[in-house]
Amino acid sequence: MRRITMDPEMNTSISSIRSQEILDSRGNPTVEATVLLDCGITGTASVPSGASTGIHESQELRDNDPKRYKGKGVLHVVEKSIPAIETLLKGMSVNDQRAIDRNMIELDGTPEKKVLGANAILAVSLACARAGAIASDIPLYTYLRKIYWPDVAGWILPVPQMNVLNGGKHAPGSVDMQEFMIMPVKAPSFVEALRMGSQTYHALKSLLLEKKLPVGVGDEGGFMPKVSSHEEMLTVLVDAIRLAGYEPGNDIVIGLDPAASEFFENGAYMLKTENATLTSSELIAHYQSWTEKFPVVSIEDGLSEDDWDGFVDMMKKMGDRVQIVGDDLFVTHPDRLTKGIELHAANAILVKLNQIGTLSETADVISQARQAGLKTIISHRSGETEDAFIADLAVACNAGQIKSGAPCRIERVAKYNRLLHIERELQSSSQFATFSFLR
């Protein structure tokens, strides 16, 4: 991060906000915002977009002009929403992040942020935080810690959940379930965890080539081979871990994100790969079987986003030994998280900034989950940019886990490289989360 010479009289009021339509990693438009302060400092941020989105998420604003980007353009955000936000925030101190976010929420006036667009609001929210950190002459993770988690002690570098085999909406033509992830939990540091993950990724590629399976990659950098079953995907993954020289279940464990809402049709789970139609109980039985055969320790969105009874049943049957993660179930929303806590529907939450649409609301959900004893995983989206904000966020709140895709494609690797830099900055004052953070 660029260092500056601090001036006690520095004016950190917001002078102007600029924005631009840029492309995300899937070639679709997204929003980049730059906040300029009176003192001359700027902060820039860009926002991601999901493919398998929960129906309860905040709403992005798109142009819906079929002549531009098949309707996915964001010129309305750039030309209308951001100028309206600029008028609102001009003259405010960039250091008052909660007031900035609150004012944007009130200006929009809808729970889904559908007037200004969650993509407009979040871009400005993150850009303000970045400008505030630069103006304060401290790293972004330290700045976020001071604002939202001042009582949290120590610095934890997160275990990466690396999506090395892709299916579902991230990889058309592969299996139904979306993500098969490796988690290098035995590493002594993040730098070693990244090495272990990368070496396993390359071992996996070699194994797929040996089996004459395709090695093209999906949206998140994982391979998307055409195999006959989900168990075959898991078998290949375990073989790759061994080929890389690691012990499955000890050095490296496996996480799944089935994204079950995407194959939930007419009240049943349709696994076209196996030509099977399953009830919630039958799908849970599949998961139970897999955790016995393979070192699967985390299952995210194993059931559809409104299958609350199914999640409760899954927790009763597996929650004592498996991390049951709510993503589409919770959509980083306090009300849905409250319901999940009351029902005991999950023991972990996936946190995505653009699901709720402001930094402050995201931070509050993280704190709510922590207070209830849920594990927290900070996550990217399938349509990403080079912005590595989530790396700083994961360290700021001591999340202990982060999802940023495979160690492939620069928009994924940018987050991992940022964590390398943070670990080097913190040196002996930080520790790696390791397997204990899953318990």
Residue ranges and their predicted role:
Residues 4-31:
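Short, Gly/Pro- and small/polar-rich lid/capping loops
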Residues 48-138, 147, 194, 222:
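Metal- or metallocofactor-binding catalytic centers and their adjacent structured scaffolds
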Residues 22-24, 29-33, 112-135, 159-175, ...:
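Conserved phosphate/anionic-ligand binding catalytic regions in large, soluble enzymes, centered on
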Residues 56, 149-150, 155-221:
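Mobile "lid/hinge" segments at catalytic clefts and subdomain interfaces of large enzymes
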Residues 28, 72-80, 92-102, 119, ...:
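Conserved active-site and cofactor/substrate-binding residues in soluble primary-metabolism enzymes
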Residues 231-439:
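Catalytic core of soluble alpha/beta enzymes
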Residues 37-41, 82, 86-93, 104, ...:
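Structural signal for hydrophobic packing residues in well-ordered secondary-structure cores
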Residues 21, 31-39, 43-49, 162-184, ...:
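Short beta-strand elements
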